[in-house]
UniProtKB/Swiss-Prot annotation:
The keyword Phosphoprotein does not apply. Belongs to the MnmG family. It holds the Pfam family SAM_GIDA_C. Homodimer. Heterotetramer of two MnmE and two MnmG subunits. It is found in: Cytoplasm. It comes from the Bacteria. The gene is mnmG. One of its GO terms (cellular component) is cytosol. FAD binds at G13, G14, G15, H16, A17, G18, V125, S180, Q370. NAD-binding protein involved in the addition of a carboxymethylaminomethyl (cmnm) group at the wobble position (U34) of certain tRNAs, forming tRNA-cmnm(5)s(2)U34. Its main location: cytoplasm. Its cofactor is FAD. This is tRNA uridine 5-carboxymethylaminomethyl modification enzyme MnmG. Keywords: Cytoplasm, FAD, Flavoprotein, NAD, tRNA processing.
Length: 631
C-alpha cells in the first residue's frame, strides 16, 4: 500500500543521529518524514547518561553552531556540568554533562513534535525501494510504502542486533527493543562491505541499596559551564554529585574465575568492541598488573533511583554480575535493577561513503551513526546533522557540503571514516585533528555558523546573537589596541603588581594581554582598561585570539599550503590503470576507494606523495586541472 503523501527526505531511526538528521532536513525547508519503531524512544540514551567529554564535547558544540539540538537539550537536562582539562590550553578543554535521561528524552521529543516540515510515523522499515541504483523510498513492516527523493538510515545497533548475557543470546536492537532483521538482510544484498561490531552496557543499580557514606563525591563546576552558544545557566535543572568507587582484587578474582562463561572470551561474540570503553572483563585481562579500576557512579536522573556504574560494562552471566557489583566498596548490598549486556550488530564499511555521507553505490541513500562504525551519542549527532543536511541538498538538486579537516571535528570524522574506514567502534579524540588550536570548543560558532546560515540551518534569533557577538569582539579588540599606558600613567602600580617585570615602556591593552601572567578579567579590572565586556563569550574570544595570535597564524599558514590541491576533483570514471607511473598497489587502492578529490586520495593508507604528483601530472595533461591548481 502506498502512503498518500510524498516526502523530500525520509529518516529511518529516532536516536541521536536520526533526530539531528530529521531536524536538519526540516530546518532547510524540506518535507521530512522520521520513521521510528517506537515514538516513545525518540532521543533515548541507550547507554551512559552523559553528553560531551574530550573530543566529543567539541562535536556537540559544532552541532550546536550549525543549529543542531544536542547542546540545547543537554542544557535543559544536565544535572552535573564540568569543564575537563580546565587547567590546560583552550584547544583541549572540553565540556561534559551528566544527563537526566527522562528530561533529555522529553526535550528531544518536544523539539521533534513541534518542528515545522517534520512528520513522525511509528513503523519499522523492512526494505528500501531502489530503482536504477537510486533510492526512491522505503517499505515498512506492515507493507506501507513511502516515497522520497532521499533516505537517511540511522539504525544504530538494530541491524541484525544480538544481545548477549553470559552464554545466553537473543535477538534485539537494545534491551526491550526488537532488532531490524529484514532491513539488515536487504542491505546485505546491496554491494556494500559489511561486518560486525559489538558494544556493551553495565548493570544498573538501585541507589537505595548503596552506602554513599563510604564513597568519594564528585561535584560539578560552580559556576556551571553551558553547552549551547544560545544556552543560559538558568536552563539547567537541579545539580547533583556523582560518586567514585573502585574495583579490587576480589572483583578481579571473580572475573578471572568466570571467563569461561564470558561470551567474548568463549568466542561466541565475533564483533570487535570499543577500544576506549572496554568491558570490565577486558580491562582485568588487558591490564593484569592493575589491582584496581576507578568506577564512576552516575545518577540516571532526578526522579529515579537508578545508578549507572560507568566502568563495569559486561556480558558476564547475571550471577557473576551480582558478585562483581557487591565486591565493590559501598555496594556490598546493592540491588541490580537491570542486568548488563553486550550487543553485536552489523555496520557498513564507511569507505563506501562520499564525504557527504551519501553511499557510493546507491544515489540518494545516506548513512549516519553506528551503521558507519562509530560509537557515541556525539559522533552520531554530528553525522546525523551532516547526513540530514546533505540529503536535503540532494533532494533540492544542489551540491553537497561537508567541512574540511581544518574547519571542524565533523570534517575530521567523515574524512577519517571515508578514507581509512574502521575495524573497531570509532570514537572522536582531539588527538585525531591536525589543527587542534583552531578547532576549539569555544570558537565552533565562529568556524561554522556563517556557513550554516548560508545553508539554511540557522534561524534569525541565533543569527542576530552571532552577529552581536562578532561586533562585541571586534569593538573590544579595537578598544584594547587603542588604549595605551606608560610607566608614568595613573594606577601603574596596580598594573605592575600583575606583571613579572614592571613596565618600562608604553604598551597597549592588547600588548599587555599577550603576556601569559595577565588575564582579560585582571586587565579590565584596572581603571585604564575598564570595563570588561558583559558578553562573556566575546570576552573569552578576545583573550584567546590575542594570547594565541602567533600560534593561530602559523597553523593557518600550514593549512593554506596543504589546501592547494585539496579540492582538485578526480573524475568518477577515471581508470587508474591508464595513469602512467602508478604502482599496481596504488592503482588497486584508488580503484577500490574511488576518491572524489586529490585531498581525499592523499589520505588513503599507502598513497604516497609521489603518487599524488603523478595524478596531478595526469590531470594537467588531460586538461582536468582548473585555473590556479596548476602552479
Amino acid at each position: 500500500m502506498l502512503y498518500h503523501e510524498n516526502f523530500d527526505v525520509i529518516v529511518v531511526g529516532g536516536g541521536h543521529a536520526g533526530t539531528e538528521a530529521a531536524l536538519a532536513s526540516a530546518r532547510t525547508g524540506q518535507k521530512t518524514l522520521l520513521l521510528t519503531h517506537n515514538i516513545d524512544t525518540l532521543g533515548q540514551m541507550s547507554c551512559n547518561p552523559a553528553i560531551g567529554g574530550i573530543g566529543k564535547g567539541h562535536l556537540v558544540k559544532e552541532v550546536d553552531a550549525m543549529g543542531g539540538l544536542m547542546a540545547e537539550a543537554i542544557d535543559h537536562a544536565g544535572i552535573q556540568f564540568r569543564t575537563l582539562n580546565a587547567s590546560k590550553g583552550p584547544a583541549v578543554r572540553a565540556t561534559r554533562a551528566q544527563a537526566d535521561r527522562a528530561l533529555y528524552k522529553a526535550y528531544v521529543r518536544n523539539a521533534l513534535e513541534n518542528a515545522p516540515n517534520l512528520t513522525l510515523f511509528q513503523q519499522s522499515v523492512d526494505d528500501l525501494i531502489v530503482e536504477q541504483d537510486r533510492v526512491v523510498g522505503v517499505v515498512t513492516q506492515m507493507g506501507l510504502k513511502f516515497h522520497a527523493k532521499a533516505v537517511v538510515l540511522t539504525v544504530g545497533t538494530f541491524l541484525g542486533g544480538k544481545i548477549h548475557i553470559g552464554m545466553e543470546s537473543s535477538s534485539g536492537g537494545r534491551a526491550g527493543d526488537p532488532p531490524s532483521i529484514a532491513l539488515a538482510d536487504r542491505l546485505r544484498e546491496l554491494p556494500f562491505r559489511v561486518d560486525r561490531l559489538k558494544t556493551g552496557t553495565p548493570p544498573r543499580i538501585d541507589a537505595r541499596t548503596v552506602d554513599f557514606s563510604v564513597l568519594e563525591a564528585q561535584h560539578g563546576d560552580n559556576p556551571t559551564p553551558v553547552f549551547s552558544f544560545m544556552g543560559k545557566r538558568e536552563h539547567h535543572p537541579r545539580q547533583i554529585p556523582c560518586f567514585i568507587t573502585h574495583t579490587n582484587e576480589q572483583t578481579h578474582e571473580v572475573i578471572r574465575n568466570n571467563l569461561d562463561r564470558s561470551p567474548m572470551y568463549a568466542g561466541v561474540i565475533e564483533g570487535i568492541g570499543p577500544r576506549y570503553c572496554p568491558s570490565i572483563e577486558d580491562k582485568v585481562m588487558r591490564f593484569a598488573d592493575k589491582n584496581s579500576h576507578q568506577i564512576f557512579i552516575e545518577p540516571e536522573g532526578l526522579t529515579t533511583h537508578e545508578l549507572y556504574p560507568n566502568g563495569i560494562s559486561t556480558s558476564l552471566p547475571f550471577d557473576v554480575q551480582v558478585q562483581i557489583v557487591r565486591s565493590m566498596k559501598g555496594f556490598e548490598n546493592a540491588h541490580i535493577v537491570r542486568p548488563g549486556y553486550a550487543i553485536e550488530y552489523d555496520f557498513f564499511d564507511p569507505r563506501d561513503l562520499k564525504q557527504t555521507y551519501e553511499t557510493k553505490f546507491i544515489s540518494g541513500l545516506f548513512f549516519a551513526g553506528q551503521i558507519n562504525g562509530t560509537t557515541g551519542y556525539e559522533e552520531a549527532a554530528a553525522q546525523g546533522l551532516m547526513a540530514g543536511l546533505n540529503a536535503s541538498l540532494y533532494s533540492q538538486g544542489k551540491e553537497g557540503w561537508s567541512p574540511r579537516r581544518d574547519q571542524a571535528y565533523m570534517g575530521v570524522l567523515i574524512d577519517d571514516l571515508s578514507t581509512m574506514g574502521t575495524k573497531e567502534p570509532y570514537r572522536m579524540f582531539t588527538s585525531r585533528a591536525e589543527y587542534r588550536l583552531l578547532l576549539r570548543e569555544d570558537n565552533a560558532d565562529l568556524r561554522l555558523t556563517e556557513k550554516a546560515r548560508e545553508l539554511g540551518l540557522i534561524d534569525d534569533v541565533r543569527w542576530a546573537r552571532f552577529n552581536e557577538k562578532i561586533e562585541n569582539m571586534e569593538t573590544e579588540r579595537q578598544r584594547l589596541k587603542s588604549t595605551w599606558v606608560n610607566p608614568n600613567s595613573a594606577g601603574i602600580d596596580e598594573l605592575n603588581k600583575l606583571l613579572k617585570t614592571p613596565m618600562a615602556r608604553e604598551a597597549s591593552g592588547e600588548d599587555l594581554l599577550r603576556r601569559p601572567e595577565i588575564s582579560y578579567s585582571q586587565l579590565t579590572q584596572l581603571d585604564a582598561f575598564a570595563p570588561a565586556l558583559e558578553d562573556q563569550q566575546a570576552a573569552e574570544q578576545v583573550e584567546i585570539q590575542v594570547k594565541y595570535d602567533g600560534y593561530i597564524k602559523r597553523q593557518q599558514e600550514e593549512i593554506e599550503k596543504s589546501l592547494r590541491h585539496e579540492h582538485t576533483k578526480l573524475p568518477a570514471d577515471l581508470d587508474y590503470k591508464d595513469v602512467k607511473g602508478l604502482s599496481n598497489e596504488v592503482v588497486a587502492k584508488l580503484s577500490e576507494a574511488k576518491p572524489e578529490s586529490i585531498g581525499i586520495a592523499s589520505r588513503i593508507s599507502g598513497i604516497t606523495p609521489a603518487a599524488i604528483s603523478i595524478l596531478l601530472v595526469h590531470l594537467k595533461k588531460h586538461g582536468l586541472l582548473k585555473k590556479g591548481e596548476e602552479e
